[in-house]
Amino acid sequence: MIIDFFGDSITEGAMASSQDKCFVERVGQLLNCTVINHGVSGTRFARQKEPSSEPRFDLDFCYRLKDLNRNADYVFVFGGTNDYGHGDAPIGAKEDNTPDTFYGAVNYLASNLLKMYRKEQIAFILPLYRLNEDNPYGEGNKKEPSLTLEGYRKIICEVLDKYHIRYLDFRNEIGKAENNPLIYDGLHPNDKGHELLANLIVKYLKAL
């Protein structure tokens, strides 16, 4: 079995003490399967209008779709928190299907993933709790106010419901970000948080 994990810094393994503690690698260990980590720190679903200080942050999910393994048995897409945090793409309209708006990027990802895999093979993981998630300026650097993190989550759910693609919400299991023993810095899970994420994903897969 081959599982692709498509994500940002959490998928990449940020704040895990070593790569083998990252939830992606833990899933591979627990299921004795091949896992492919497509996590790139700082990346967003939607395309950035103004270049980021770190160029790799602008390797958006829509651009990186081409990197996924079409022979994978399952693909998990875990993102959206950086669109809230520091993305400058407009929210857009429900019917958009372009990487240049958030609605458009989620539509683009969903519609193109369905060209690559059966819908039963695809699952999105919704953004987890994070500190200051109710700030319409995200991490504080947005020039224009936008949605809270919950607003971005609702759009992801709305679009995926339209395409009948599964999504997993682990927020309650991981818990609020503040003073959470599973969260390192108000956003990224620590080793224990990565372990719980892996166990939740394995539980989902075994129930299919």
Segments predicted by a language model, with ranges:
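Conserved, well-ordered alpha-helix/loop/beta-strand core segments that scaffold catalytic motifs
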Residues: F76-F78, Q121-I125
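Structural signal for conserved beta-strand scaffold positions within catalytic alpha/beta enzyme cores
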Residues: N37-G39, F124, D169
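N-terminal secretory targeting modules
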Residues: M1-F6, I10-I36, Y63-A72, K115-I122, ...
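Conserved SGNH/GDSL esterase-like catalytic core that processes O-acyl groups on lipids
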Residues: I2-D4, E12-D100, G104
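Catalytic His-Asp segment of secreted/periplasmic serine-dependent ester chemistry enzymes
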Residues: G87, P127-L208
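Active-site phosphate/pyrophosphate- and oxyanion-stabilizing loops and adjacent acidic/basic residues
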Residues: E25, S111, K154-C157
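Residue-level signal for short, function-critical loop segments
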Residues: S9, T81, L128
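Generic structural signal for well-ordered alpha-helices
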Residues: L65, V106-A110, R153
